[in-house]
Regions:
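Structural preference for solvent-exposed beta-strand-turn elements
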Residues: 2-372
């Protein structure tokens, strides 16, 4: 269903003030993508939205408790007017602008959210994308507490290193840091998102080719992990990357004390233009060698693909460029999720040009405000 725009006016004394335009999005069949991409982009653009049909015909109807916590935090972080956001809701609104049409978000605005019992990675992605919409001279710092790592999770919300590099191209200073680890279902960790707009995103960013490999960063960590497990992980990664490609990765460890027991491995591939992130979360007693080999295989597969980003990082980067009103050219692996994301971005008014290449899809993406 194509997006619908709602408009009205508000009478104040004898003067009629036009309210902001509200985009209506039908979330049926694409609920996760609306949460992951549409709402953070609209928050960055300062565009109000009404979401309808959110899980309205499924066995479990409407917003889940975790989704409610996520949306309320996004609303707080952007000082939005949230209406109808409760467990089981199928229809809700987020007003990201004031009635006079000016942005609500103030300079140096930030949120401290204690989300014990909820994963923070999706929110890290939400607030990072929204931060790309900061105006020149504005800054913010968010601090989120909750599960920093969830088993079977994707790298959604972990792509901070690559997004920070893209942000610099768009005049934004961005830093995402994990300051304490917490694994589902017991621990609570802390992640901060800090952003400062140095200049307007005025130029197009041409990242059609990833360019040269700059580094591979490996982060090993956990809450009270077994030292021998991390030692074996590190040794296997060092050996695999050196024997196959003569690459020496930069390895760091992040260890927290707490009551939960968990370990994780994160590999960030840093290229001249773009990069990729792969994570694996395991129990304290998980065998380290399969974990290491899986991660190295993914990293080397990305390097051989000639893509600008992996799928998850790439779609997030496209969303960020639209939120910042910039223009971005990239090459991504064609996937069903990418196709769905492009369709959603078009519903938000983005202009997207596509060109096929061997094993890749070359894309040029411009937001409505940067087009023309």
């Amino acid at each position: 269903m194509p997006p619908v725009f709602l408009k009205g006016s508000l009478a104040v004394g004898t003067v009629a003030i036009e309210t902001t335009e509200t985009l209506e999005i039908d979330a049926s069949g694409r609920e996760a993508m609306v949460l992951d991409l549409a709402l953070p982009v609209l928050a960055g653009q300062g565009r109000s939205v009404r979401v309808v049909g959110f899980r309205s015909s499924m066995g479990v109807s409407g917003l889940s408790p975790r989704e409610v916590a996520r949306l309320r935090t996004l609303g707080l972080a952007t000082s939005a007017r949230a209406t109808g956001i409760f467990e089981g809701a199928n229809d809700f609104r987020l007003g990201f602008k004031s009635e006079q049409g000016g942005p609500i978000v103030a300079p140096s605005f930030g949120v401290q959210a204690d989300l014990g019992g909820h994963p923070v990675a999706p929110l890290v992605s939400d607030l990072t994308i929204a931060a790309f919409g900061l105006a020149a001279g504005e800054s913010l710092t968010h601090e989120l507490k909750g599960f920093t790592h969830v088993r079977s999770a994707t790298a959604h919300g972990y792509c901070g290193r690559t997004l920070a590099a893209l942000a610099r191209e768009f005049g934004l200073d961005l830093k995402i840091s994990t300051e304490g680890l917490g694994f589902e279902p017991q621990g609570v960790g802390t992640v901060s998102v800090a952003a400062s707009r140095l200049s307007k995103a005025g130029r197009a960013v041409d990242w059609k080719s990833p360019g040269v490999l700059r580094a591979i960063h490996v982060t090993l960590g956990g809450v009270r992990p077994k030292p021998e497990q991390l030692d074996r992980l590190e040794a296997e990664i060092l050996e695999s990357l050196w024997e196959t490609r003569r690459i020496e990765p930069a390895i760091s460890r992040v260890v927290s004390q707490g009551v939960d027991l968990g370990a994780f491995l994160q590999i960030d591939v840093e290229c001249e233009h773009g990069g990729a992130t792969f994570i694996d979360v395991a129990g304290r007693s998980a065998a380290p060698l399969p974990l290491a080999r899986r991660a190295v295989k993914k990293a080397l597969g990305f390097l051989d693909s000639e893509a600008t980003f992996d799928e998850i990082t790439g779609i997030t980067a496209l969303a960020a460029s639209i939120a910042t009103a910039g223009e971005l050219e990239v090459s991504l692996p064609p996937t069903e999720r990418l196709s769905s994301a492009l369709s959603l971005f078009r519903d938000l008014g983005a202009f997207i040009e596509e060109e096929e290449a061997p094993g890749l899809l070359r894309l040029k993406v411009r937001s409505t405000s940067s087009a023309g």
